Amino acid sequence: MATPHINAEMGDFADVVLMPGDPLRAKYIAETFLENAREVNNVRGMLGFTGTYKGRKISVMGHGMGIPSCSIYAKELITEFGVKKIIRVGSCGAVREDVKLRDVVIGMGACTDSKVNRMRFKDHDYAAIADFDMVRNAVDAAKARDVSVRVGNIFSADLFYTPDPQMFDVMEKYGILGVEMEAAGIYGVAAEFGAKALAICTVSDHIRTGAQTTSEERQNTFNEMIEIALESVLLGDNE
């Protein structure tokens, strides 16, 4: 049944949902990659769609910015609409010199300065990691398309405008591939409620050099990342 944030019914969503932060990107994905896509949510402008990709039912829905927002939608999709897998498809900023604009990053683990997973885990550190099979399928899907991907830790930040830029030095030292704002929260929600999750990000800007893509490019042209996510779902069905 509908929730305060999602005006859909059981069965409206597929068991796998791709989740970009931007609801307009969700609309773009549905219109570009899915067949027979129909709108299944529009509460607060957080658009959601369900259609098919190569005959496979798949949904896509925005999750907003930051862990509090994405956690609401991820939790409700899992507990109220039967979603089993969530794939975050979004952007991240690079801090390492060897990570370039438009590189595709697969978040095997997600560090964070947020306390949400400590709140879930009795104030202990929780290792927020992606589902291994989903990681493997994404890597295999990328290889099949001859797309090079980076696999490793990302960092989910609570603040977009950080007051502590020296933290980027620490991230670089520890090999963080990209900085975003949601993956650790989605991984925590998935673990708490028995689902699986993965974050795939395209590098939209470089925090060190200032290089960046345009907002229009971030909405419309990260097609390789979306194709990897969709093809990984099909590989998962064949396991």
Curated annotation (Swiss-Prot):
Binding site for phosphate: G21, R25, R44, R88, V89, G90, S91
Residues forming the catalytic site: D205 (proton donor)
PROSITE patterns (UniProt xref): PNP_UDP_1 (PS01232)
Any one Gene Ontology cellular component term annotated for this protein: cytosol
InterPro entries in UniProt: DeoD-type, Nucleoside_phosphorylase_CS, Nucleoside_phosphorylase_d, Nucleoside_phosphorylase_sf
Single GO molecular function: purine-nucleoside phosphorylase activity
Binding residue positions for a purine D-ribonucleoside: H5, E180, M181, E182, S204, D205
Site residues by UniProt (Important for catalytic activity): R218
GO biological process: purine nucleoside catabolic process
Highest taxon in the source lineage: Bacteria
EC number: 2.4.2.1
Reactions catalysed, as given in the entry: a purine D-ribonucleoside + phosphate = a purine nucleobase + alpha-D-ribose 1-phosphate; a purine 2'-deoxy-D-ribonucleoside + phosphate = a purine nucleobase + 2-deoxy-alpha-D-ribose 1-phosphate
Keyword set, alphabetical order: Glycosyltransferase, Transferase
Record carries keyword Transferase: yes
Oligomeric form and interacting partners: Homohexamer; trimer of homodimers.
NCBIfam families the record matches: deoD, PRK05819.1, PRK13374.1
Family, as annotated: Belongs to the PNP/UDP phosphorylase family.
Function, in words: Catalyzes the reversible phosphorolytic breakdown of the N-glycosidic bond in the beta-(deoxy)ribonucleoside molecules, with the formation of the corresponding free purine bases and pentose-1-phosphate.
UniProt name for this protein: Purine nucleoside phosphorylase DeoD-type
UniProt source species: Pectobacterium carotovorum subsp. carotovorum (strain PC1)
